[in-house]
Every structure is written in structure tokens, then in C-alpha cells.
Amino acid sequence: MSDNDFWPDGYRCCVQLSFDYDSNSALVRRAPLDIVAQSRGRFAPNTAIPRILDLLDQHGIKATFFTPGWTVDNFTESCEEIVSRGHEMGAHGYLHERLAELSWE
């Protein structure tokens, strides 16, 4: 197979763009009472995700957002917006658990 047969429409490469959308999920486990840290973690759903989605839309780019289940449970609106704009969501654990500390159950 030649390169011309592999790449459609004259394209010569591809790029996969992904984001880790954690919000404050890691902080909830590590520092649940640190209000300043929790506030910083809310920047993603309230400011960063809308800006990123608008930028991706402007350029016609689709991306994958790897997101912990805790973020989906607690910031449902922003996750639904990601999907409604045609992006993919991927699993990223539930709450940044330390796997070595989890029981087999």
C-alpha cells in the first residue's frame, strides 16, 4: 500500500487531541477541607471547559475529554455540554484513588 492509498484527501498526518478534565476531583480525596484548593478546582467547569469548547468549535476540532466519574456526577452540565458539541468522553477512574490502597472488592 502506498502513502497515497493510506491517507484520504491528500492528508499526510493525523492528530489526536485529549484533555484531562479533573475539576477538583483529586483535591476532594486529598484535601477535602481546603476551601481555597476546592475553589481553584472549580475553574475547569466554570471557565476553562467553556473556553476550550468554544476554541475547538472555532477550528472545527473534536477532542476526547478523559474525566473522572466524580466530575461527571458533580459537574454534569459541563460534561453534557462536551458531549452535545460532538466530543468524546473517556473514563479516568472515579476519584483518583490510589490503586495500591484499594481492596480487591
Question: PLM features: residue spans?
Answer:
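Catalytic alpha-helical scaffold of carbohydrate-active enzymes acting on polysaccharides/glycoconjugates
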Residues: 1-105
